[in-house]
Amino acid sequence: EEVDQVAEVDVVVEEVTEPEPEPEPEPEPELEAVDPFAVEVTPGTDSDSDGLSDTEEKTIYNTNPRLPDTDSDGFLDGNEVFHRYNPAAPGTLLEEGIVVLETRSVAESETVDYTFTFPAVWETSVDSDDVFILDAQTGQGFRIWAVEKDSAQSLDAWTEDMTTLEEPLEGTTKNGLPMMSSQNQLIAYVDLGFAVLVMEYDTGLKARVDYLQTMQMMLNSVE
């Protein structure tokens, strides 16, 4: 009986290696919000350590930036400005025409007025939101406005509800009005009872603070 012979054939099976999956790309880290204008604030030079910057002494009060008590009355120039007195001679800043009185109305209620004083040499304007703008003509200035508030609400409660201040500084103006300010003292809120006056210091592109004592003087004049 014949038997068909089948030739043996070596079959080579190549091992197929599956490619490893590509690793998933790592998520890009979230970018933190960065204020492009956030720079460190530089205090103005105070050569005689009297509480007034040299710029304030030269451009507003006509005092000697190297003499802490220009009129030799026993009071530092900066202390006199804080209390709204003329540091160069007897009399108040208002009496001597160094500051002028401004009367403003709360935007939402034109029948309710408040007043404050500011340096007479500064330029003023009012923007479309009824914000009063003070231009010191040195790249610095102030923005002042008022918003209505329930007279029964404390300034502390209003500040917590309406602002983002962290650890605000509490104080009282020379006219006895409650006041809150930021840690750097560049923004302040004064309780008018029926409203809150807001005063913001605009340090400008150079981020200098030459008018901090003048800001305190203006806050002390609010009524």
Model feature map: region roles:
Residues 101-106, 129-131, 170-181:
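Short, hydrophobic/aromatic-rich segments at coil-to-beta transitions
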Residues 45, 49-51, 68, 72-74, ...:
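Residues in Ca2+-coordinating acidic/glycine-rich loops
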Residues 2-45, 87:
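N-terminal, intrinsically disordered, polar/charged segments of Gram-positive cell-envelope systems
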Residues 41-43, 64-66, 106-108, 144-149, ...:
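Second-shell loop/turn segments in exported
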Residues 149-210:
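Signature of long, low-cysteine stretches enriched in small and polar/charged residues
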Residues 38-44, 55-70, 78-99:
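Proline-centered structural pivot motif
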Residues 216-223:
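Extracellular, beta-strand-rich glycan-interacting domains
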Residues 111-158, 186:
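Secretory pathway targeting signatures of secreted, lumenal, and periplasmic proteins
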